[in-house]
Amino acid sequence: MDQTQNTIAGIGEINGSIKTEINAIATVDDSNEKLNQIINSNQKILELLHQLKLTVSSFTPASQLHLLQRLNSLVMELDNMAKLSDKCNIQVPIEVLNLIDDGKNPDEFTKDVLNKNCIAKNQVTKGKSDAFKGLRKHLLEELEQAFPDEVDRYRDIRASYAAEAKRLAQTQSVLPNGDAKVKSEL
């Protein structure tokens, strides 16, 4: 394959990946559009139910036609929402539905799930960090028995590096973890 063919093949691969990304973005936009249509349909249904309640609460034989029109509008909107829901695939955990049935805020479920996941990941990370600290300590103890002079030099180098990093961080308004301090403007 010559240089021109390589270039054309490379461009084809780039175009293919761009098309894939565009299709993925279009799919997300399409899903959001469908979800927005369902939300709008829900709002219309709530509005129609409210109007229907008002019509029924002040019902007179003369308002029967008006009541039937509102009932027909509600049925049409429910049918529209059913059609829209077939196009939109949203999975809601049963726990969220149970919370709603119990009159609780479904955001609590999301908060609990995120907290549990974060706590679990933090514990795993802390365990790994503690294991590495223990390994480092054990290695230093073993090295100190075998090479005491080298370990002393290593500790001196680490101490001077830590002092320099701390001094540099203080002069540059950088936190020890590498984050920059941000001054709040009031």
Curated annotation (Swiss-Prot):
Keywords, comma-separated and alphabetical: Nucleus, Transcription, Transcription regulation
Keyword Transmembrane assigned: no
Location within or outside the cell: Nucleus
GO molecular function: transcription coregulator activity
Annotated TM spans: none
Biological process according to GO: regulation of transcription by RNA polymerase II
Gene Ontology CC: one annotated term: mediator complex
Assembly and oligomerization: Mono-, di- and oligomers. Component of the Mediator complex. Interacts with GEBPL.
Function (record text): Component of the Mediator complex, a coactivator involved in the regulated transcription of nearly all RNA polymerase II-dependent genes. Mediator functions as a bridge to convey information from gene-specific regulatory proteins to the basal RNA polymerase II transcription machinery. The Mediator complex, having a compact conformation in its free form, is recruited to promoters by direct interactions with regulatory proteins and serves for the assembly of a functional pre-initiation complex with RNA polymerase II and the general transcription factors.
Family note: Belongs to the Mediator complex subunit 10 family.
Record-given protein name: Mediator of RNA polymerase II transcription subunit 10a
Organism: Arabidopsis thaliana (Mouse-ear cress)
Taxonomic path: Eukaryota, Viridiplantae, Streptophyta, Embryophyta, Tracheophyta
